């Protein structure tokens, strides 16, 4: 079973595209040395940590015309 479930992740964002972009940007930040915002991640992989942070609302995104920014 995948965690977090994709259908529940899609409730946190407005589209699949936004989910992919936000997760990729956050994963890149983690790869570049950012500290994970969750204490006990289910995985050590950056994309898994990023999706868990989105699911648990630790990562917020703002959508503009050309970009998606994460905080």
UniProtKB/Swiss-Prot annotation:
This is DNA-directed RNA polymerase subunit omega. The RNAP catalytic core consists of 2 alpha, 1 beta, 1 beta' and 1 omega subunit. When a sigma factor is associated with the core the holoenzyme is formed, which can initiate transcription. NCBIfam families: rpoZ. The keyword Transferase applies. One of its GO terms (biological process) is DNA-templated transcription. GO terms for cellular component: DNA-directed RNA polymerase complex. It catalyses: RNA(n) + a ribonucleoside 5'-triphosphate = RNA(n+1) + diphosphate. Promotes RNA polymerase assembly. Latches the N- and C-terminal regions of the beta' subunit thereby facilitating its interaction with the beta and alpha subunits.
